[in-house]
Amino acid sequence: ASGGIAQSFRLDVSSEENVKNCLDSIAEEMGEIDILINNAGTTTVGLLDQTDSEDWDMVMNTNLRGPWFLAKQWVSRRKEKNLTGGNILNISSINGEAPQKGNGVYCVSKAGLTHLTRQMAIECARYGIRVNTLSPGYMRTDINKEFLDSETGKDFIKRVPMRRYGTPDEMTGPVLLLVSDAGSYITGSTLIVDGGHLLSTL
């Protein structure tokens, strides 16, 4: 945005101490955060009965514990400083709404994140803090475009009723709705943006 300032901070979301220190650093340099978007994520591939505990912990620490650490510390700071209002937006996935063979740990972590949203929405509403989830379907990005252009990817798209993948730009409107005054009466909700994918099978 015109006149805005963007700054990056290194953060290990799986460490609560690191999260706390990072929020301290941000506050010192830029002031308190009004909108927290939890978007860190990772995955591993395999059936649940063949998944080792290290892979399970890696995914859960990033996809579920991390957002909880950030939300917990962020809410605590606002309470301590008597700040009202603010928004938390957790980026989940349609995999949090429906299972997918071979992607079990990720699905479980995202389902947990979606329910974390609901629980925190109940607990934070009295402070004017809204907590919501955005659950995208498959988005075409530089990371996955090679797969999506493959024969397997082209076949996979047949499962999407709109017969195309989404683009990162198509996330702008949903994000703005959930974190701006346009969505001032929305909390504890999950907005699915998937081209109708969940209407068919994953």
Model-inferred region functions:
Residues 93:
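Residue(s) in the substrate-gating loop at a strand-loop-helix junction
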Residues 125, 130, 186-188:
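Short, small/polar-rich loop/turn modules that mediate ligand/substrate recognition or access, typified
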Residues 48-49, 98-104, 126-127, 163, ...:
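Active-site loop immediately N-terminal to the catalytic Tyr-X3-Lys motif
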Residues 71, 109, 117:
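Active-site helix of classical SDR
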